[in-house]
Amino acid sequence: NAPRPSKIVKLSLEKMGMNKEIRENVYSSGEAALSYLKKNLLNKNFYHLGPPKDFDLFLDFKENKTSSIEESSYLLCTGLFEKQSEDLNYYKELLKESINKKMICTNPDLLVDKGDKRELCAGSVALIFEKMGGKVLYFGKPFPEVYNQAINNEGKKVLSIGDNLNTDIKGANLLNYDSLIISNGVHKDEIKKEGIDVVSKKYETV
């Protein structure tokens, strides 16, 4: 789950030292969303929720980005604004008059750990919008569309590896894939305290 095109994600992985043979097969949630947007909403004005680092997602149709949420046809959520990265109440106020618009969420993750810092992701904003009565179209794990676009799994065995029970493991279970949980990730404190069986049931992954 990354709210940017696959080519941008591959560059990041290259800088991290990932083997070329592996990273060439990377497919991002942003790429899945981009495919949908180009087919269905290419000429529509949109309001972007997210930081400037995600602008690569809509470079091909950046002229349709509007700074006025009232003038937008749909909402494109890639994350949180840099100056409003922790206060979800800000988004409740911002979105309350746009419940009739569709939101495209390019990263269903609710949160991510970056080093010792925990950050909110696009999924947290999308969840608030849904609870307010809005409609959200998700791209990324655990939703099937990203798997359908990324994997030709006919006759193949698939192993889904990740640290997030809400997305990585839930997505694998929905599609009947084998999965491997990285226990030293976002749920590490819960798993250490309660055990994986209890925690996985709490997140309704099984």
Language model segments and positions:
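Asp-based, Mg2+/Mn2+-dependent phosphohydrolase catalytic module
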Residues: 2-206
